[in-house]
Each structure stands twice: as structure tokens, then as C-alpha cells.
Amino acid sequence: MSGVVRSVLWLSFFAVILLSWWMMFAMAQMMGVDWIGRPQGMMDMGGGMDGMSGTMSNTMNGTMSGEMGDMPMMQMTTFGALFPMWVIMMAAMMLPTMVPTLRSYEDLISSANGTRAGWLGVLLGYFVVWVAFAAVITGAQIALMASDIIDDLGISNSLWFAGLLFIVVGLFQFTRAKEICHGVCHSPMSYFLGHWKTGFAGGLRMGLGLGAFCVGCCWGFMALGFVGGVMSLLWMGLATLFMVIEKLPQIGHYVTKPAGFVLILAGIGTAGYGVIG
């Protein structure tokens, strides 16, 4: 019976991930954006980022149709519309990174006094923290749109801002805070052994702690969505892949700092292009 419960829980977990990705794809289609988060047809147009932003502003004054029907773009500039989008995005991008953590807890079900209720508690606590982060980054997006730093698709209007964001996230990869947070995400078993609590409530408490460290580790990759657009499925896929790799016990420590160098160089290149472009 326990094997059946385990299978149902894992299948449900992966079903939620797949559903979340499908919903993000459906929203992108509904908003009329392509796989890199630009309005359909923008890839064939020339000009710099400022010209592109102006064209998109004209596009977003109308309505765009998709498989799910027509929806005015202005609806995606309010907290009520953006917050659910970010919550779904958190599920699509961050739940896959939790697989090693849930597997570690499963080991304690067989070797210690872990329970399936505790497993669910860990999962819920982890996701609650990311839902809270979704509220924060939704507020940040609204503030950036109000300041005209990004457009209504979450795309940076300034190469300087995009370059600065790359550099800040890249530099964070070398900080002590990143090292501590990544250490917990990279070795969840150590966290469980040092903060062990039994039952659903105990799992929930540990999940909240793990979620907080995970936000501390990965917030920058979420913020990078403001470079190319928060509806960019390409960015979502690449960021998810990197965060999964970064948390793998075998190779996670080897990719953190190289990624920082790449991001810093990308930031310098982006800002430099803003000067000469």
C-alpha cells in the first residue's frame, strides 16, 4: 500500500509541473508572444531595444488573440493578473529543483521516522515560500513598469538596466550569502539532520526553512526574467535547467562560480552595446 501512495504522490507532483508548463505556454499564446517572449512577428523587425519597445507599446494598446480567446494586454499589468502568473511560473520552474530534497526526505522515511505526511509538509512549506516570493516579484514588476524601466511584457527598456541586472546576479554568485544558501539546497540531507521535526507540521516547518534558503539561492535567476521578458519560455527553460544542475549533489558546486563569470561578462557586453549601439 505504501508503494501505491508513493507512486500517486510522485505522479501528482510531476503532473503539477507539466500542467504548470502547459499553462505558461497557453498564456504565452494567449498574449501573442513567441518562445523568447516577444510579440509574434517581432523577430523579423530591426532596430534596437528602444525601437522594439515602442513597437510593442503600440501592439499592446490593442487586443491579442490566442488559443484561449481574446484578452486585453492591460490585464497583465495589474497585481491580480501578474501574481497568479508568477505563482504558476514558480511551480513550473522551482518544483523540478526540489526533486533531490524530496528524495532525501524519502530516505529518512525508510531509515528514520519520516512519514508521507511529513513529505507533503516539506513540499507545501517550500512552495508557500515561493508563493510569497511571487508576491514580492509581482510588486517589483509593477514598480518597474510604473517607472518605465520595463514594458508591459516585462522586457527591459534599457540596455543599461539589463546589463546591471546581469552583473548584480553574476556578482551574487561569489558572495557568502550565495554559498550558504546553495550549501543548504545542494545538501538537503544535512539540513534535515540538523533541523529534524516529525509529522506534517514538522515537515512544513522544515519546508519553510528550505524554501527560504532556496529563494536566497535562486532569486537572481528569477529577476533575470526582466532582461528578455518574463513570458520568455526560453529563459524559463534555461533558468530551470541551470537551477536543477546547480542543486545536483555531484556537480552543483562546479557550476556556480563559472555561471557568475558568464553573467558578469554578459552584463558588461550588454551595457557596452548600450553605449555604442
Where are these regions (language model features)?
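Final/C-terminal transmembrane alpha-helix of multipass membrane proteins
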Residues: 14-20, 257-275
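Small-residue-enriched transmembrane helix starts and helix-helix packing motifs
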Residues: 70-91, 165-169, 198-212
